[in-house]
């Protein structure tokens, strides 16, 4: 056991060799272009028998969807769905307004009934 040395000092690791694992750096430009290509095209994938490609930031069906609905039909259905959601939101707003109106009218009716009962009681006391 050393008196003035640290027993926890690790041994130094030997430096790594700087050999590259790929031989792409040794190829000339034309060979690299042939091997790797510069035009990658749009990314495509197959998922559950459906071919999809990435266009304009969205995955769209490359051809006909497995259910027999094409891309235009899907877009039309999405647009219709959006319209129906907007209509549904408008109808919910109208129902909320009608419920507020009903509760206000009911409260006014109860107040008038109370006033009428008080007037009847005061009228009976006068007689």
Curated annotation (Swiss-Prot):
Region (Leucine-zipper): 77-98
Stretch forming the signal peptide: none
GO cellular component: centriole; centrosome; ciliary basal body; nuclear speck; nucleolus; sperm flagellum; trans-Golgi network
InterPro entries reported for this sequence: Chibby_fam (IPR028118)
BP-aspect Gene Ontology terms: canonical Wnt signaling pathway; cardiac muscle cell differentiation; cilium assembly; fat cell differentiation; floor plate development; negative regulation of canonical Wnt signaling pathway; negative regulation of DNA-templated transcription; protein homotetramerization
Tree of life domain: Eukaryota
Chain positions covered by the region annotation Minimal region for the interaction with PKD2: 60-112
Molecular-function GO terms, alphabetical: beta-catenin binding; protein homodimerization activity
Entry keyword Coiled coil: yes
Cellular compartment(s): Nucleus speckle; Cytoplasm, Cytoskeleton, Cilium basal body; Cytoplasm, Cytoskeleton, Microtubule organizing center, Centrosome, Centriole; Golgi apparatus
One Pfam family in the UniProt entry: Chibby
Residue ranges of the region described as Disordered: 1-25
UniProt KW keywords: Cell projection, Cilium, Cilium biogenesis/degradation, Coiled coil, Cytoplasm, Cytoskeleton, Differentiation, Flagellum, Golgi apparatus, Nucleus, Phosphoprotein
Coiled coil (residue ranges): 68-110
Modified residues (Phosphoserine): 9, 20
Tissue expression notes: Found in heart, brain, lung, liver, muscle, kidney and testis. Levels are approximately 3-fold higher in embryonic and adult heart than in lung or liver.
Self-association state and partner proteins as the record states: Homodimer. Homodimerization is essential for nuclear localization and interaction with KPNA4 but is dispensable for interaction with CTNNB1. Interacts with polycystin-2/PKD2 and GM130. Interacts with the C-terminal region of CTNNB1. Interacts (C-terminus) with TCIM (C-terminus), TCIM competes with CTNNB1 for the interaction with CBY1. Interacts with FAM92A; this interaction facilitates targeting of FAM92A to cilium basal body. Interacts with CIBAR2. Interacts with KPNA4.
Function recorded in the entry: Inhibits the Wnt/Wingless pathway by binding to CTNNB1/beta-catenin and inhibiting beta-catenin-mediated transcriptional activation through competition with TCF/LEF transcription factors. Has also been shown to play a role in regulating the intracellular trafficking of polycystin-2/PKD2 and possibly of other intracellular proteins. Promotes adipocyte and cardiomyocyte differentiation.
Protein family (similarity comment): Belongs to the chibby family.
Additional record remark: 'Chibby' is Japanese for 'small'; the gene was so named for the RNAi phenotype seen in flies.
Protein name: Protein chibby homolog 1
Native species: Mus musculus (Mouse)
Gene assigned in the entry: Cby1
